[in-house]
Amino acid sequence: MSFFSFWKKVATGLTLLIVTLTPLTALSQQHFNGAAALEYARQFVAIGPRFSTSSGHAKAEAFLRDHFRHDQLEEDAFTASTPIGPVAMRNFIVRFPGKKNGVIVLATHYETNYWLKNINYVGANDGGSTTGLLMAIADQLRAQTAHGKTLDGYSVWLVFDDGEESIQPTWTDSDSLYGTRHLAAKWARDGTLEKIKAFILADMIGDKDLDIQRESQSTDWLVALVRQAVKKFRYNRYFFKKDEAVSDDHLPFLRRGVPSIDIIDIDYGPNDSYHHTDKDTMDKISAHSLTIDGDVFLETIRLIGMR
């Protein structure tokens, strides 16, 4: 064999090796599609204000219903007793089956505040970003469960809950968390609650300036798993630099004994100046932050499935 022929064969072999390994290498380096989550959020937020009793709220319901029409979708309609009287509300639950016996719930609220109805409050970060996040997570779960397949771990249910926000400007235990209080009670009655291995809440985490607090009431072992997921992706600078107790949609489940965690960035804008104002708009959220969220959520799901 000539010197030229020898090195030609070596080069050919290396080329084949690279072509063979590249798909696996690329797969191992893939990140969550935060751009898709941002686009879903943009479409959803374009509906406008979506407070209870409004036409925008009805449009938000129709948006979710249409998007998930080919999935295992349940609509959980109920009437909430509120300071303005009985109000029709609706949770949306999308189910993706798993091999293991049990359920992981990922949740977000989707409505905006009734008491902000007189301003153009669209809740891009607060309700909009996390609706987009769960929709993009659904894309991945849908691909994994296509053609009758099941997820390797537990079933995953996505909950888009209604009525998280208070009707009145002052938040109280009785005027807030309507959807999750209703759902936790319903699932306690019918035995569903016993199947839930973890409840993971996403709230206000599309913020470009992402700084997720450690919600201090959250279940310790879930916090530890999220830390593990964060460490894997080297996202430490975005997570858990301070502790804070937050009244949020995880509490109705936590109080009934379900391991629960609230993934929240409660400080939004300089001195929290964007929170619950008409400054909560799409220009304040980013695909980068949603990529971080999605990576951590999906890895946390995987880690829970390994317990």
Language-model-derived ranges and their functions:
Residues E39-K99:
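A non-catalytic alpha/beta surface segment that caps or lines the substrate-entry region
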Residues F3-L14:
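Bacterial N-terminal signal peptides that target proteins for export
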Residues F44, D76-F78, F96-G98, A107-E111, ...:
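Active-site-proximal beta-strand/loop segments in catalytic clefts of secreted hydrolases
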Residues A26-S28:
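Boundary at the C-terminal end of the N-terminal hydrophobic targeting segment
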Residues G13-P23:
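Bacterial N-terminal signal peptides
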Residues Y121-Q228, F233, R237, K242-A245, ...:
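Acidic/histidine-rich catalytic neighborhood of metal-dependent amide-processing enzymes
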Residues H31, A35, G56, A77-S81, ...:
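Active-site-adjacent substrate-binding region
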Residues E39-R50, K117, D203, K208-D209, ...:
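Acidic/histidine-rich, surface-exposed loop or edge segments in extracytoplasmic proteins
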